[in-house]
Amino acid sequence: MAEQHGKTLVPQIRFAGFTDPWEQRKLGDELEFLRNNTLSRAELSESEGTAFDIHYGDVLIKYGSVLNLEKAKVPRIMDSAIADRQTCDRLQDGDVIIADTAEDSAVGKCTELCNSKGKMVFSGLHTMPLRPMGEYASGYLGHYLNSSTFHSQLLPLMQGIKVISISRSAMADTTMTVPSVDEQRQIGAFFDRLDSLITLHQCKYCGVASWMLGVALVRLGSESDGAFGEMKHVLR
């Protein structure tokens, strides 16, 4: 919750030591729209090629609010000649990639690039790449633009029935809430730690689930009747 004071907001819950109000600004005044390419999934590879290409399907399903290029598996442009011919903008740390098309209201989900370390990275099919024109703390934009507070603005702006999309002009007219850079840094770090904790518990859950499934299969396989018993007999 936050109290409105003209064009500023004062959050009721925040990190200790911060008292300045949060400013409200138009997205189009803060972020510059870059050029993407339209390469299909068939032109990408999981291992071949040197230029990375961020596909909208991965933004929607695979990537979190922050895309760490050193850790994430990002597809590459398979044909180096095609990669060399790209006229779209090369991405850098802090750029935000938004999925502008989806089959549901997930349209607008984004990821913020980090740890690109000079690698050639492009924004691919059905994406909307943006670059901050001013200083923003790492991780803040990715987490904020994925928040329900911001995403609720996009719902009435979405177009289509079977395939839903949002335009650049509509995105540019949305309103962002912008704290000081120091407070952004605290917010980004907090959600990064939270994401890491969630991932850790998901890994633990998957490990326990796999172990339980293995135990169940062993028990079923030990029975003389049924498909598992027959399978065990065949494997012997």
Regions found by a protein language model. Name each.
Residues 55-59, 72-146:
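A short beta-sheet element
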Residues 7-8, 94, 172-173, 186, ...:
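Histone-fold recognition with a strong bias for associated Lys/Arg-rich disordered tails
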Residues 28-31, 42-81:
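DNA target-recognition patches
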Residues 29, 185-197, 201:
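Extracellular/lumenal glycan-associated surfaces
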